[in-house]
């Protein structure tokens, strides 16, 4: 009869072969690690999603019903509700585009401080709008209104971004940092050109241009939403389906390559999808620099995982909840609907400064 193995005082004996302290182990079962370390992290994620969904539902109901004095169910009631549904549709598109684009951009660049705006989307939008008003006067605003100009502006932004990173990343010495640096320089040059043209405008034209360049949810037209919504949904779905690839890209170029992933190709494909999202939202409502950074930072702090399958939905839900809540409070309580983007940008800018000061570096 075999004698039991001696163990050190105060220590439990080792489990028999083929077992662990948690129970028996099946040698043929594939080994895998989950997105969450503990069950508590998974429960916390469910609670976060439930809370954000509740906030989104309550704020949506408030936007639709608050201040609608028409008799419920009447034609006037549904006419008012339909107008508000269009605003909610714009908010949903903006939240989707900024959240998915910013989180994906953070992943491929390996930096959670910068935003896709660094590629010069907003500077190009401002330059095109300013040039139209500079050449055509006040009529330039009308020229930029319509489905054709909307698609043309979005396509121009996508082409510029695609040409930028495909040219820089395809070269042997190309790198993400070089691409970002060139994007900053181009954005600064376009901004300086726009400022120069704006100084030469007459006051009336400048006033019309300023109203267009100010990011505002009310700027979006119904025909724009019908085009932007399917594109945004399809691109966001593609990014979510590529979540596992984004998880691998987040490990770094060397680790991703060793795991069999073509890192540069994944980088270019992701940047193309990000460019489409940013072009859609910028052409739809105008520049909103810090919205994506705000909701992405919020998602990182709420979700205890690095898996993009879980981060991306929370970022989009947080973006929708933040925008609808701000829209409801400022438009229906303080009657200052135009200040929604101002408040969002203010909070996002403060969050950016706090994050930079805590990290101590860019």
Residue spans for each PLM region:
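Alpha-helical transmembrane segments in inner-membrane proteins
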Residues: 2-362
